[in-house]
Amino acid sequence: MSRCEFGVILCLLLPAGVVESAGVDRPNIVFLFADDQRADTIAAHGNSNIQTPNLDRLTREGVSCRQNYCAGSYSGAVCVASRSMIMTGRHWMRIDDTRNWTGLPLLPEVLGKNGYVTHAVGKWHNGRPTLARGFQSGKAIMMGGMCDHTRVPLQDLTGEGELTNSRVGDGFSSTLFADAAIDFLGTQEKSTNPFFLYVAFTAPHDPRNPPESFRQAYYDNPPPLPGNFLPQHPFDNGQVSRGGRDEGLAEWPRQPDVIRDQLCEYYGLITQLDGQIGRILDALEKHGFGEDTIVVYAADHGLALGSHGLLGKQNVYEHSMSCPLVVRGPGIPGNTSTMAMTYLLDLYRTLCGYAGVEVPVGVDGYDLRFVFEGTQKSVRDSVFLAYQDKMRTIRQKNLKLHVYPEINYQFLFDLEADPLEMTNLAKNPDRASDIERLVCEMKAWQQRLGDTLPLTVETPKQKEIDLTGRSRLPDKWQPKWIRDKYFGGRDTPDSQGNPAKKRNE
């Protein structure tokens, strides 16, 4: 076994065990989970163009993981794979049954069997059987991947695992989910058991229709375009040529004014969500849970939104695979950051550790408690990112290698000098040894994960692509003003692909 193979296997498998950690025994756990939120959209992390006072408060009171990643996805619905990894603690390549997670103990399931009251609120995109197996109850559950934020289909989860009380929520999605979370906290004041409250928002996922006052505030003071904005992606990465709903939310080539307005709407969703985070944090204090509760704030992945000419998250750039992770709680020093490279799936081991619960056999990742508490600087030497059979990426320290097997193309970025991933160093002969080392590391990860994708092909596809003029019809979740603004008033196609009649809204 090579040295790099051994290092990767240790990184993925080394059991952290259940060891003592500073702070109270059996803390409550509140997991606040955003949808499609870029890592660079928290003001306290250096973005002066966005208003996030409550997330800023959370960063002042906790630790921020500044190099946190989603590991990628087996499908265009990256959120499904991301949530699967969090709930099972396994890399997506090691989840054989991606829908039902057969035979895999789920994080809330394990906590529930060890005395925790487990309750779910909000988005669940992984099927009813897993929801019912994982949680003892739930309110304001939105089954599926997305919805119009003003027309949220809601259900409640009973103790028997049934979904009941189907309704359309009267209010904005993030507000409805915060209301349900706050209601649950009010029921726990006299409970003698700790609780695990999972609140999965569907913001800032599109449709990007925040309440008008929130989007108008950013129209009046718009954020700049991303520093790596491009009208088109410069080559066929295997995904853009296939289309996809995310990339169809604006025409090619991307127009600066269109992307700027979509950024305003996206920021408006985040600021509105931030207010609901503040309400939940205040409710924790009101009900006496502030001192003995672990609060996790994270997102399932990032989003391009104009970066590299892309809109979606079906890629392996930093803007799409990195995502926020902020944790507050007993024993965690406030106003601190860590540059340890972490995965979202590490939260399984970490939260089991805080709960004093034995980690099930087969769970990947690391317990991050000592990273959060400042006594450990790092947990892994590299991170491996992958999207379907189209892209493979390895990051080690400041170097990041992208491999696109279908076109036999490599990109090497120095993230310290080039955090926006714009300058390809792969053709530089002085970097040949770096590429060789990173390919070795990548292959070691592939071997461990059972990833048999070749990194080159005998007959590569054409690299060049021009998507000028490509567009698509809006999906059923886009409200009328978005259809009018970005789709020329066109409507959702019917089952035969014909434009449907206009809806009056």
Kindly label every feature range from the protein language model:
Residues 1-2:
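N-terminal secretory signal peptides that target proteins for export/translocation
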Residues 5-16:
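Bacterial N-terminal signal peptides
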Residues 19-405, 409-411, 419-440, 453-454, ...:
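Formylglycine-dependent sulfatase
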Residues 416:
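Residues forming the ATP-binding cleft of Hanks-type serine/threonine protein kinase domains
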Residues 443:
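Sequence context surrounding c-type heme c attachment/ligation sites in exported
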Residues 447-450:
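Short arginine-rich
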Residues 452-464:
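Mature extracytoplasmic/periplasmic domains
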